[in-house]
Amino acid sequence: MTSAMPSSDIVKNKPSSEHIDIVNEVELKPRYDEANLDKFGAVIEIDPVEKALVKKIDLYMMPILWLMYFLNFLDRNAMINGKLNGLDKDLNMKGTEYNTCVSIFFVGYLVGQVPSNMILNRVKPSWYMSGCMLAWAIVSIFPILAKDYHGMFACRFVLGIVEAPFYPGAIYMISQFYTRKEAATRMAVFYTGNLLASSFAGLIAAGVFAGLDGKHGMQGWKWLFLIQGVVTVGVALLAFFTLPNSPLQTRWLTPDERQLAHNRIAIDTTEKREGTNVWKGLREACFDYRLWLFALMGNLHLSANGFKNFMPSVVQTLGFSTTITLVLTCPPYLLAAFASVAVSWSSGYFNERTWHITISKAVAIVGFIIGTATLNVGARYFAMCLFVGAVYGVNNINLAWTAATVGQTNEKKTVAIAIVNTLGNLSFVYTPYLWPDTDKPRFPMAMWASVGFSAGTVVIAWTLRFILSRDNKKIRAANPDAVNFYVY
């Protein structure tokens, strides 16, 4: 949030009644122009100087984060498309061994997230995030050396550990540079890296399998791991020089822009407090019960997204060839990319969370029900487009909502984001077992479970709406002049 005065004055003017003076984490509260604030205290229209700053951050930070996430998801999902090229048979996998290799990734992924975000708050994010990317790039190539289930199991577990820092770290970086009204849209744009990777992964795999399978004695799925890993190494080296650290420590911002970037986020944070140490941030986050509701909502939401690790196999049940199957995985994710950005933009524009989650989940529920209720090919593919297209905006809204609600200090915010993402991704440890091959083609257990998970997400969202509305009343009672309130 900013005051109604020009943003350039916030930085350049001498102290006055409207001057915002922030030195590190020490903030002197400004006087607000309430005509330019919504009911939660967020600025409705920012001035041209601040708009230019936001565009600059969009141009410099978002593309590299997006590309990193695109490759992050391509690398972890190479195994999923590899199954269509005989990966599981080449490694002599039996029973649920393939499903276990899918899920073990998330065990490593979960173990690393909270410690990683605690470290992130005390090191240079540009170095840390880029270094982690270089590590996962190298590890993602190792599966070409796997000889059996045990080798792939080890590769997937280690890959989960080295990929763990990226997503929660990137979400934290976005929350450091964008206000409540801006963050969800940027997170949605960032998340399209995931969606477009899911969309085009099948096309990339189809091309690799068709052109390189058997070349130089290597199966197509091994070429897929190798090519994607090498590209990721190159992008990791680029990221070392382009990622920012914090608003006050960003090489491609001028000194005035750095101060403005810091000020606008500090003022936009409800019940902002001075920084603390990472252990106190961990304690404060863990004792804020609202965090656990956000975490539960994230877990239920992502539990309904278990299809993402089996989408090629689900589409395959429509009865088409391997190449056509891989091509047909593309449109649902393209639709999801568009819908995710649209829903998140709307959530930010109207500064509203609950109804956006409710409507998205209602559409997804319809898709899950159709998907298991019929064997008609057209209807089932429509259902896939429906539930894939509808669900992805919810995660962006939840994480942006978490950062805005449980982010009174940077240390608390980093831990909160990591905990919500960790417990959310815990779902991917057990949801693979909801999609056994024996349930083809309807996958009734997975589809009906997803209906229940989606309904639970809506219940938690409305519970949070009630709680935050009550918290806002407490803020008004304690300070009748308060203008900054929790969004719901």
What label would you give each PLM region?
Residues 110-150:
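Conserved MFS/SLC helix-loop-helix module at the cytosolic interface between two early adjacent transmembrane helices
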Residues 80, 280-345, 355, 399, ...:
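Extracytoplasmic gate region of multi-pass secondary transporters
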Residues 1-71, 77, 95, 240-275, ...:
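Intracellular terminal tails of multi-pass secondary transporters
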Residues 111-124, 338-352:
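Helix-to-loop junctions at the C-terminal end of transmembrane segments
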Residues 127-141, 355-370:
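Structural signature of the two symmetry-related core transmembrane helices
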Residues 80-112:
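Extracellular/periplasmic helix-loop-helix junction of adjacent transmembrane segments
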